[in-house]
Amino acid sequence: MPNIKSQKKRVLTNEKSRASNKAIKSEIRTAIKKALAAKKDEATDATDLINHAVSLVDKGVKKGILKPNKAAREKSRLMQA
């Protein structure tokens, strides 16, 4: 446990950001799974789900939650046959 006041504050802010990042990552993973499942079943709304997943991945990179290479890999996998 930190003794310095600023470090105690950092512990609290880190917990908040960790929870936020975890929620966003979970949302991204769920969107990717739904898009891949729809694509596999050849559903009519597959393109909408893929576009939504790609949008979330891009937002994750913009916020610094995902690394750019991982985002590119995920987007590539979504777009492939």
Swiss-Prot record:
<keyword id="KW-0699">rRNA-binding</keyword>
<comment type="function">
    <text>Binds directly to 16S ribosomal RNA.</text>
</comment>
<dbReference type="InterPro" id="IPR036510">
    <property type="entry name" value="Ribosomal_bS20_sf"/>
</dbReference>
<dbReference type="GO" id="GO:0006412">
    <property type="term" value="P:translation"/>
</dbReference>
<keyword id="KW-0689">Ribosomal protein</keyword>
<comment type="similarity">
    <text>Belongs to the bacterial ribosomal protein bS20 family.</text>
</comment>
<keyword id="KW-0687">Ribonucleoprotein</keyword>
<dbReference type="GO" id="GO:0070181">
    <property type="term" value="F:small ribosomal subunit rRNA binding"/>
</dbReference>
<dbReference type="GO" id="GO:0015935">
    <property type="term" value="C:small ribosomal subunit"/>
</dbReference>
<feature type="compositionally biased region" description="Basic residues">
    <location>
        <begin position="1"/>
        <end position="11"/>
    </location>
</feature>
<keyword id="KW-0694">RNA-binding</keyword>
<dbReference type="InterPro" id="IPR002583">
    <property type="entry name" value="Ribosomal_bS20"/>
</dbReference>
<feature type="region of interest" description="Disordered">
    <location>
        <begin position="1"/>
        <end position="20"/>
    </location>
</feature>
<protein>
    <recommendedName>
        <fullName>Small ribosomal subunit protein bS20</fullName>
    </recommendedName>
</protein>
<dbReference type="Pfam" id="PF01649">
    <property type="entry name" value="Ribosomal_S20p"/>
</dbReference>
<dbReference type="GO" id="GO:0003735">
    <property type="term" value="F:structural constituent of ribosome"/>
</dbReference>
